[in-house]
Regions:
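N-terminal hydrophobic or amphipathic helices/low-complexity stretches enriched
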Residues: 19-73, 240, 247, 303-305, ...
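Noncatalytic luminal/extracellular "stalk/propeptide" segments of secretory-pathway proteins
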Residues: 45-163, 270, 286-287
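Extracellular/luminal Protease-associated
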Residues: 109-224, 230, 295, 325-328, ...
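Long, well-ordered, tryptophan-enriched scaffold segments
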Residues: 190-191, 195-199, 214, 218-287
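His/Asp/Glu-rich mid-to-C-terminal helical/loop segments that flank catalytic regions of hydrolases
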Residues: 345, 349, 466-530
């Protein structure tokens, strides 16, 4: 109890000192936007992992870090290079069909479905199909979609989603690609077909399917292989999903209606098999994380780190939309990388001396499956036990005034409490994720820190369900997310960006100055990773 009281006291002191400053104090949004304008310029060519455009962006970041007086913290100066395997589908030499009652029913790649090339797909597959509901096994809730099923030699068909009585972060964890495949593979499956629930799709299928035109990647080192035994991986268009269920006694519409109530779905064999022929083009490449250090000043705590992370990669040059082929990624995530640079610059000018050190981490390969942070978390350039927290900044969307802050991971660790204190000191309300079904908690780089036992969270400008602000966010996702229109021509709320920067900076300072490390909450599912790490 005494330790907890001391922790709260230190937090209140740090927050109180910070709250005396009129917000925003350190930022005006303009310097942040100046960084964004460089990183999201057409000259950076969309910052595809391993591309010349990304290397140019990283060179710029390193130059800015040097100007801010930060020390290199990579394995080669500011850089930590990782090896990747890139896979691209050759569609003209690939095909897909259903086989029903001995008859071939061809499917159109791109229109009906597309291959996921994150997997080293088998050249040819023909296998029976089984619908397995959400495809989840969650022992903490005594929930198992696969109970009693024999999937040996079969391909599992799943509808993305989760049952209602499973908390958001827990459901998100088990819906991660690696965890879901681990469960299916253990049951004997050789492949997986995922169907997006139209109610939770961020972008329309027409844009989602463009992913097939870009190479997927994986880390080349076998230690990172989480797709063992997966011979086939497909995404299926919800508008075409009825074809899968013909003659099964169930319709796709029926399943969607059950999923609306987040009830457990029926499981049943389908009347068709899947037949696939795949040709892949593979190549090896390298890409780097950029890492810098601001040393702390306390004799003991300077050996511990608060990590600020943001991914710098985006989608590169791709299929044109309205004549534009450059996917600039201004909000996703030049905005986050720019914020780290702006905070680094502000600390250079600040007389404030931090007790803990700050690690600025700009990761590659996020758009390819959180690969850069996955590599760093497994091979950190500092003592892994020295990292006390990760504050991840990814697509925080300052497109409406910042009145409400959404904290992903709010209830999982002390970090959530600290974020709430700092935000409220700036007159900003806080909410947990209002749409846990979108699985944002596991869809960005904080997740790899969490899996290594390090308390972590992400935050974004928030909106309440049904509000005008939420409508603006939904329109942004539909029109700009993973599209060339996420560029420098979109409306941006600079005061919102500045205030968000103040909150991130304030949270960072609170963690850096607190004599105690952030702890996982006793009832957090993710606490087990800290225990496994021996902390």
């Amino acid at each position: 109890m005494l330790k907890k009281l001391l922790h709260i006291s230190a937090l209140l002191i740090a927050t109180s000192a910070f709250s005396q400053q009129t917000a925003p104090t350190h930022f005006d949004g303009k310097s942040w936007w100046d960084y964004v304008k460089v990183l999201a310029d057409d000259n950076m060519e969309g910052r595809e992992t391993g591309s010349a455009g990304l290397r140019r962006a990283e060179t710029y970041i390193v130059d800015q870090l040097k100007q801010a007086g930060l020390q290199p913290a990579g394995t080669d100066g500011y850089y930590q290079t990782a090896k990747f395997t890139s896979r691209a589908i050759v569609e003209k030499d690939s095909s897909l069909a259903l086989v029903r009652n001995g008859k071939l029913e061809p499917l159109t790649l791109g229109e009906d479905a597309f291959f996921s090339t994150r997997v080293d797909l088998a050249p040819e597959v023909e296998a029976p199909l089984v619908f397995v509901g959400y495809g989840l096994s969650i022992p903490e809730k005594n929930y198992d979609d696969l109970a009693g099923l024999d999937l040996h030699g079969k391909v599992a068909v799943i509808l993305n989603g989760s049952p209602a009585d499973v908390p958001g972060p827990l459901a998100s964890h088990y819906q991660s690609t690696a965890e879901r495949w681990k469960t299916l593979h253990k049951a004997g499956a050789i492949g997986m077909i995922g169907i997006a629930n139209p109610a939770s799709m961020d972008i329309p299928w027409s844009r989602m399917s463009l992913a097939r035109t870009r190479p997927s990647m994986s880390l080349a080192d076998p230690e990172f292989n989480d797709t063992e035994g997966e011979k086939l991986a497909l995404y299926f268009n919800p508008a075409s999903a009825g074809k899968l269920f013909e003659g099964s006694g169930h319709s796709f519409e029926e399943l969607i209606n059950i999923a609306k109530g987040r009830k457990q779905l029926p499981r049943f064999p389908l009347t068709a098999s899947i037949k696939a022929k795949v040709k892949l083009e593979k190549k090896d490449l390298e890409s780097a994380n950029v890492i810098a250090r601001l040393p702390g000043n306390d004799a003991t705590l300077k050996n511990e780190y608060v990590v600020l992370s943001a991914h710098i990669d985006h989608l590169g040059i791709g299929e044109p939309i309205n004549g534009d082929r450059i996917y600039n990624g201004a909000m996703d995530n030049a905005s986050g990388s720019a914020l780290l640079l702006d905070i680094a610059s502000s600390l250079k000018k600040s007389p404030e001396k931090l007790n803990r050190s700050i690690l600025f981490l700009f990761v590659t390969g996020e758009e390819k499956g959180l690969l850069g942070s996955k590599y760093f978390a497994a091979h950190p350039t500092v003592d892994p036990k020295s990292m006390v927290a990760d504050i991840n900044v990814d697509m925080f969307l300052p497109i409406v005034p910042l009145k409400l802050l959404t904290v992903f991971g709010l209830a999982e660790s002390d970090l959530g409490d600290m974020a709430q204190e700092v935000a409220q000191a700036h007159g900003v309300s806080v909410q947990a994720d209002p749409e846990p079904q979108r699985n944002i908690f596991i869809r960005s780089d904080q997740y790899n820190f969490i899996r290594h036992g390090i308390p972590a969270l992400a935050m974004g400008v928030g909106a309440t369900p049904g509000s005008p602000e939420q409508k603006i966010f939904k329109e942004w996702l539909t029109q700009r997310y993973h599209a060339p229109s996420d560029d420098l021509n979109q409306p941006v709320d600079l005061p919102a960006a500045a205030l968000y920067e103040e909150v991130v900076r304030g949270l960072m300072i609170s963690v850096a100055q607190d004599p105690h490390r952030p702890q996982w909450k006793q009832d957090s599912f993710f606490r087990r990773y800290s225990q496994a790490a021996g902390e």
